[in-house]
């Protein structure tokens, strides 16, 4: 019997295993999943704060971070053709879509998605080996040989006709990822884009720890101070932390900080009043002054901003701590400018533990549209092992599930069919 082995039991790996089992002729192919964790899907259970934001209705190449957008297009088309949402519907998963296009299981439970996958894998006879750590993977004339250590610490050797590498990247080591997939891709001669934490918070050079825990609606702009240009703009809720900035819009900006191609001297500029231009905001501030006779700057922000945030902004504008009605009219233009151009420099992405996904990876031109590695027939790389990281909102799970489905189906197609036995004619 021919065998397909999937290395990694995360979203991409489970989808690959199930798609392969669904596509294989009955009794012709054994499908095996190896995962180092005590249970598969550990990271999947944590996605979407446990609700599993598994897809998005706005899938487009522009929603992904990669060094080669042109190479991404045919790959993303193949992933879209795998139709993850329709595939899940056929498995019995009912979903809902919110106003931002984010797709969730109707139950809002990531555990239900995992249980559904596990149930179908068991029904189709897929062997799942947990607590199994892959040590080496080698290619030979008959296919591939995998050396791994099982949960009891015993060495095990498996033979495979096709291997799907779904071991994730470096993001979220607490979920069992260790970057083996990308390291193995390099060992096979594959070229890698440098790895970096993607969709993560940002440390700033001078964090204001008094603001830790405060949230504010803002337009966040990533600047390249060396090139004097805007890299990207995101709107949403910013969370101030004791180390810098967080929140979905900040995490989105972190995706642009790829080593070698991102801004050399990045900075984030916050606009705390994006609905008003600077002239209108100046007028708004000036109109408040007659309402606050003899009042201190701390009173100025009542009804506008969190008082701690207002005090920090006042300090950033370098205005004196005097009654607001004693300040010159020009002060309100200065304050409006500070509120719309609050600069945070010295950016450093937080580490792998906080990152939601991995930027960089095996370059996309190294694989076919069905994510088969061009240098090794029967070897596939899916999900985070590839240089494709999605934005927040279900784009990464779309890529994980879709690339896994595409790989699983193609792996079955790639297997050499045994020659049919000749019919013996009766004499």
Predicted regions located by residue number:
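Glycine-rich loop(s) and the adjacent beta-strand/alpha-helix scaffold that form part
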Residues: 162-208
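Short hydrophobic core segments
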Residues: 5-7, 34, 134, 157-173, ...
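A conserved short coil-to-beta-strand element within the FAD-binding core of flavoproteins
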Residues: 130-143
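An anion/pyrophosphate-binding glycine-rich loop and adjacent beta-alpha core
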Residues: 38-40, 45-46, 54, 58-61, ...
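Glycine-rich FAD pyrophosphate-binding loop
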Residues: 21-49
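A glycine-rich dinucleotide-binding beta-alpha-beta segment and adjacent secondary-structure elements
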Residues: 130, 310-389
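Glycine-rich active-site loop/strand segments that organize a redox cofactor
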Residues: 49-97
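Beta1/beta-strand and adjacent pyrophosphate-binding region of the FAD-binding site
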Residues: 1-12, 32
